[in-house]
Amino acid sequence: SGVWKHHKVVPETPAGFTMRGTVPTDENGVDVMMEIWEKGSSEPPHSHPGDDMTVVIEGKMSVQFFKKDGEKLVEDGKPLILNKGDAGYIEGGRIHDAKYLEDCKLVYVHDKQFGFDAAAVSA
């Protein structure tokens, strides 16, 4: 399908990641991205300013949630495993990582303008 073409590499993002997004961003709307992740790629613990929803079109991924315990992060429950056809929801500000267990195609919807905050999770 043509919808999965024209993905681009975005500077300062994890290896194995390409995306296609909506432009321009409506500050009161949603950002929608079509993401492709290679098997074995991952995202470090981070959070987003708004709620997000990921729909797995192809592949399998794992999301681990974390909470702060003083100066360090500790796992918050078991990893959430998302397979083809599954959708996952993450509240804004919730710390999580992501691991791509298979090649993945995702539709990612973020409330308001997308943001990635790794600084908020570190001391």
For the regions a protein language model found, what residue spans apply to each?
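A short, N-terminal "cap"/entry segment at the start of jelly-roll beta-barrel domains
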Residues: 1-34, 44, 79-80, 123
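Double-stranded beta-helix
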Residues: 4-7, 27-30, 95-123
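Conserved hydrophobic/aromatic beta-strand scaffold that supports enzyme active sites
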Residues: 32-36, 53, 79, 87-89
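Short, conserved beta-strand element in jelly-roll/cupin
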Residues: 36-38, 48-69
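Tight coil/turn sites that cap or link beta-strands
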Residues: 38-40, 84-85, 91-93, 103
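Short beta-strand His + acidic residue motifs that chelate non-heme Fe in jelly-roll/DSBH
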Residues: 43-45, 63-64, 90, 95-101, ...
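Short acidic-glycine-tyrosine-enriched beta hairpin
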Residues: 68-92
